[in-house]
């Protein structure tokens, strides 16, 4: 059962054990089970989502087993995962991060830039980490000049001057 990364716990919210999750792109509104994974840990068990609501730029998520602020703070830094089959389809112009990793990145002229090897959450515009064929890295913001073609299995960039230098 494939697990998809929905985001990361960045802080505790309130006093009742809500986790402040960044990067979920709204998937937490519908998913009923998530897993929290700290770096270096094996696959964690799924936990029931008791409540999920938007909280500014974050999602405030309450799960079984986390009932106060102290226990929520213990999860700061953990990845939030869900089973692929528990998630709705991403829809047009939407995507899950796991759908992007491994995709080739090309310019609108068809020139190869590299392969998506990671993503950064910046709080505003997420940034693709693109590893070039030479082994270098390019950071490409998911801005209007980037088209994610999940069906075509590629990312197309119309880079502004200087982006790829």
UniProtKB/Swiss-Prot annotation:
InterPro entries (alphabetical): PRC_barrel-like_sf, PRC_RimM, RimM, RimM_N, RimM_N_sf
UniProt key word Chaperone: yes
Keyword Transferase: no
Keywords: Chaperone, Cytoplasm, Ribosome biogenesis, rRNA processing
One GO term (biological process): ribosomal small subunit biogenesis
One GO CC term on file: cytoplasm
Subcellular location, record wording: Cytoplasm
Cross-referenced Pfam families: PRC_RimM, RimM
One Gene Ontology molecular-function label: ribosome binding
Domain of life: Bacteria
Gene3D superfamilies named in the record: PRC-barrel domain, RimM
Predominant location: cytoplasm
Domain PRC barrel: 92-163
PANTHER family linked: RIBOSOME MATURATION FACTOR RIMM
Stated family: Belongs to the RimM family.
Listed NCBIfam families: 16S_RimM (TIGR02273)
Oligomer and partners: Binds ribosomal protein uS19.
Job of this protein: An accessory protein needed during the final step in the assembly of 30S ribosomal subunit, possibly for assembly of the head region. Essential for efficient processing of 16S rRNA. May be needed both before and after RbfA during the maturation of 16S rRNA. It has affinity for free ribosomal 30S subunits but not for 70S ribosomes.
Domains as described in the record: The PRC barrel domain binds ribosomal protein uS19.
Protein name: Ribosome maturation factor RimM
Lineage start: Bacteria, Pseudomonadati, Myxococcota, Myxococcia, Myxococcales
